């Protein structure tokens, strides 16, 4: 995708195609979690999908669904900032959130996100505790009321502060069910997935095998950029 978030969270050299090919054929294997999610739509349909990074409903989905394609072609992931600014103002919505079969809790939110990993574009750690292989979902509820609340969220995220703020609530669980008092737009891994009235997400531990840089591969420097090592030529057919 535009942000290449899964590759970023896996520390792959995203700007070097040759090195990525080398990793694909000769790297080391790692098992990571995926997330199975069921959406209930306005017409009562239930659809099932799988994602690897972040899914959600509300403000984040507004951004993904309203980012201009031509701007993404020009500016890449920075295009999301323009849509984000346009959608900053908006009302909060009532939702209920239940974790691991527990008692549903009510929130007034701008967005609810379910994450498998936490790094965004630009190296921003939205959920520093989120890990791709911990068998847990990271649930984030954002409930800002005005610009000052958004500023608090931005400062906490950028500075990676461990202090809690009332408008940014996070928890971990293996399963999360969210019901919306009114239909809300949704997204999975940056793709708009329509308006929904409920979601039910479950972690699928160790369900996907990915290839990573081999531990003894000296062709990748600490900054994630590959050194000038050629891709091996295929053996000639005899």
What are these regions (language model features)?
Residues 99-106, 131-132, 141-238:
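ATP/nucleoside-binding phosphotransfer catalytic cores, i.e., glycine-rich phosphate-binding loops
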Residues 37-38, 56, 66, 114-115, ...:
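Short beta-strand-to-turn element immediately C-terminal to the catalytic PLP-Schiff-base lysine
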Residues 1-110:
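Catalytic core of DAGKc-family lipid kinases
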Residues 56, 60, 113-128, 192:
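Glycine-rich phosphate/pyrophosphate-binding beta-alpha loops
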Residues 71-79, 120-122, 128-149:
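Gly/Ser/Thr-rich active-site loops/lids in small-molecule metabolic enzymes
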Residues 41-43, 126-131, 190:
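Short, flexible, solvent-exposed loop/turn segments with mixed acidic/basic and small polar residues
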Residues 60-63, 105-108, 120-123, 147-151:
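Short acidic/glycine-rich loop or secondary-structure boundary segments that cap or lie
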